[in-house]
Curated annotation (Swiss-Prot):
Superkingdom of the source species: Eukaryota
GO biological process: translation
Protein name: Small ribosomal subunit protein eS1
Pfam families found in the cross-reference section: Ribosomal_S3Ae
Organism: Enterocytozoon bieneusi (strain H348)
Subcellular location as annotated: Cytoplasm
Molecular functions per Gene Ontology: structural constituent of ribosome
Amino acid sequence: MAIRAAGTYVSKNKGAKRGKAKGKENRFSKNKFYNLTSRLFPITNHGTTSHPKMRSKQDLTPFLVGRTFSVNQGDLECADPMNAVNSPRYFKFKVNAVCGNNCNSVFNGMEVSREKITGMIRKWHTLIEANIPITTKDGSTWRVFVNAVTKKKNPDSLKHYAKASEIKIIRKRIVETTLEHLDGIEVEKLVKVLSTEGLAKEFETRCNEIYPIFAMIIKVKPIKNMQCIIVKTRSDDPAHLESDNKSDLENE
């Protein structure tokens, strides 16, 4: 057997080097990014979302439709984060269509921050809660949650509790006012009403003669959002396509 001289051995793996770690692959390099957009506020672009692309010509629409996200009202009305007003309201959106690189979303509810809700509750005051189901013009059903807290009626008294009869009347007036202003309107108008304090001030004005209160709409929850319901057409159903093709062949 021939013995090779020192230094004449050939390495099997010429490219490998000792002590050099393998570079980590970026997990987002194979993702496709889409813009989250809506048309209800001055700022229409609300960030991006992504999904792994497994094939070059794969349609990612089924994976994107139905995604939800929430945006602060200050970011919806001002593009500059330094000048944006810190609002306690967060508007929720849901993706219902994909157009190019844009995920078009629709209104899907509103919620006030936890800090604002807990800050309303005070010691020796009465908390009045109400929830009202409403129906918008497009047939969508929503549930509106309202919280009201009694104010100081007598400055010399330490406790400011409302009677049970007063609580019933206040809750009844809140329900009537909500149905009067929100029931049967369009979704765009509903969003405009929720983005201001006008309806809450109306609650306080109508209930002031019974007992002074501080009111706020804390949440709007979708029960049946017609904008998010995708109607399956006849052309999209493969069973109907097969039956149509068979009938065409028989007619020929």
